[in-house]
Amino acid sequence: VIRPIAKSDTPAIAVLGERFWCESDTFSYFGEFDSVCAQRALYRGLANGSFLGWVSVGSNSEIEAFMVVASDKALWNESTILREVLWYADESKRGAAQAMRLFHTAHKYAVDNNYDHFIMTRITGVSSYNKLDSFYEKCGFRALEENYIKTLS
């Protein structure tokens, strides 16, 4: 079952988020995962409307995957953008129908709400990293940029 994220989902999402944190290369740039900080940031974003998203709930009523997006406007011409902040499925659920439905739910939301652009990302270290290029291209996306990060402290 795919449903909208509720503020009450933040603890469960933080648990999955920590798995992502450890699986990806994120920890090597940002340090240790802070579950309380992650929960607060997600809760605030959901409460003030800067974040929205969806969860995939399994037969045991546990969240198996989630997608968080942010609504934005382009600086150069105010075209509307729905930007993925985080899309994560437990490794055992990647490529499964429910995880893919999260993507399609977000895409449908962007179309139904007349967004001009839908931006998806990928982070190094995750086992599905190399597969995402071909998946996104099949869905009509084009690569725009790569980000580089330098740790300053």
Question: What spans do the regions from the language model cover?
Answer:
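A short beta-loop-alpha structural element at the N-terminal edge
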Residues: 1-15
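Conserved GNAT-fold acetyl-CoA-binding loop/helix
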Residues: 21-41
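A short helix-loop-beta-strand connector motif used in the catalytic cores of GNAT acetyltransferases and
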Residues: 40-55
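Conserved beta-strand in the GNAT
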Residues: 55, 61-71
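A conserved beta-turn-beta hairpin within the catalytic core of GNAT-like acetyltransferases
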Residues: 73-84, 144
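A short, internal acetyl-CoA/4′-phosphopantetheine-binding micro-motif in the GNAT/acyltransferase core
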Residues: 85-96
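Conserved acyl-CoA
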Residues: 101-117
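Conserved beta-strand-loop-alpha-helix junction that forms the acyl-donor binding cleft
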Residues: 118-132, 151-152
